[in-house]
């Protein structure tokens, strides 16, 4: 079988692999970064992924505390740096570094690389009181990293429409990406965010795109959504996860996923060996919206939008 890879084009003209197959958060997240918490398993998964064909998209973040593992894997691979797309995030809510610039300098040192391909503000919750700079000032810091070449692209994560509007008022460089929770059961993390990003040429990245399968029970098999995904899985001879991930990309969204199983990592990197029709994409969208909203993260803050957001 021939290998197919697809890319999204960002608003600055740069290309980004259309799926991130190694997310180093979620299952790999840890509360401290020590020799005792070092995960050889994560290193093995990254090294395995880096042996696959194509440009490999790895998603990291300050808050995950997995820089040592990413750095170790990068030191072991024979894949050239320009065949690796590395995303990192400054996490203001945990105050591990003084600013985006400080955070990135620490990250680059720990990962043993001179630059990241994408650097994100992990949340909009930046304040003078906690971080010593406002959201707008944090974005200006991000722009300097972009201009210096330490970050080839810059963006945000978990931003609502009003947060992006604040950034856009002062931006010399528009965010290239907004990484949010997105799945068939949560098609707007906050009201109107998917449409707003599309209208402003900001690529949406989806974390937890497979939430519906993660939380699926035996009783769910008879629900219309899962019945239809199974039908498509049998039609295309693909896993149900591949069907959902392909739906995500057909919505113009970049899925961020990961697995400890080599076959699933390979399946994700080979996602573009098949396609869904427009009708199939629309039906998954409709059946997903009919299902009760499923939010895995930020429930305290954004849970109030669960039903209203899906109607936008």
From Swiss-Prot:
Phosphoprotein keyword on record: yes
Induction of synthesis: Transiently induced shortly after the switch from aerobic to anaerobic growth (at protein level).
Site residues, Lowers pKa of active site Tyr: 89
GO biological process: cellular response to oxidative stress; ketone metabolic process
Documented EC number(s): 1.2.1.-
GO CC field: cytoplasm; cytosol; nucleus; plasma membrane
pH influence on activity: Stable from pH 6 to 9.5.
Major place of residence: cytoplasm
Chain positions with Phosphoserine modification: 123
Active site (UniProt): 64, 122
Summary of temperature dependence: Thermostable up to 40 degrees Celsius.
InterPro entries linked: AKR (IPR020471), AKR3C2/3 (IPR044494), Aldo/ket_reductase_CS (IPR018170), NADP_OxRdtase_dom (IPR023210), NADP_OxRdtase_dom_sf (IPR036812)
Alphabetized UniProt keyword annotations: Cytoplasm, NADP, Nucleus, Oxidoreductase, Phosphoprotein
GO molecular function, one term: aldose reductase (NADPH) activity
Localization per record: Cytoplasm; Nucleus
Binding of NADPH, residues: 25-27, 59, 157, 179, 208, 210, 257-261, 264
UniProt-listed Pfam families: Aldo_ket_red
Binding partners and assembly: Monomer.
Note: Present with 4030 molecules/cell in log phase SD medium.
Similarity annotation: Belongs to the aldo/keto reductase family.
Function: Reduces aromatic alpha-keto amides, aliphatic and aromatic alpha-keto esters, but not beta-keto esters.
Designated name of the protein: NADPH-dependent alpha-keto amide reductase
């Amino acid at each position: 079988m021939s290998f197919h890879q697809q890319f999204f084009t960002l608003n600055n003209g740069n290309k980004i692999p259309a799926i991130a197959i190694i997310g180093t958060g979620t299952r790999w997240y840890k509360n401290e970064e020590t020799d005792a918490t070092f995960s050889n398993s994560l290193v093995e998964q990254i090294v395995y992924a880096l042996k696959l064909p194509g440009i490999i998209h790895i998603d990291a973040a300050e808050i995950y505390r997995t820089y040592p593992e990413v750095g170790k894997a990068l030191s072991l691979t024979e894949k050239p740096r320009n065949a690796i797309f590395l995303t990192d995030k400054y996490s203001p809510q945990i105050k591990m570094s003084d600013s985006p610039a400080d955070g990135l300098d620490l990250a680059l040192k720990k990962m043993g690389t001179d630059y990241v391909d994408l650097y994100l503000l992990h949340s909009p919750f930046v304040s003078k009181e906690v971080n010593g700079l406002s959201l707008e000032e944090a974005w200006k810091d991000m722009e300097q990293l972009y201009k210096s070449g330490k970050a080839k692209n810059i963006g945000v994560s978990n931003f609502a429409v009003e947060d992006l509007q604040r950034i856009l008022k002062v931006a010399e460089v528009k965010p290239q990406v907004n990484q949010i929770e997105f799945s068939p059961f949560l098609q707007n993390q906050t009201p109107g965010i998917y449409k707003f990003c599309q209208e402003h040429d900001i690529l949406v990245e989806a974390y937890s795109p497979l939430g519906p399968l993660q939380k699926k029970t035996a009783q769910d098999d008879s629900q219309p959504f899962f019945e239809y995904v199974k039908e498509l899985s049998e039609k295309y001879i693909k896993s149900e996860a591949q069907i959902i991930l392909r739906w995500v990309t057909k919505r113009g969204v970049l899925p961020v996923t990961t697995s400890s199983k080599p076959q699933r990592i390979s399946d994700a990197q080979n996602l573009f060996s098949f396609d869904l029709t427009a009708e199939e994409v629309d039906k998954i969208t409709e059946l997903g919206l009919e299902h009760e909203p499923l939010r895995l993260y930020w429930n305290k803050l954004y849970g109030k939008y669960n039903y209203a957001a899906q109607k936008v």
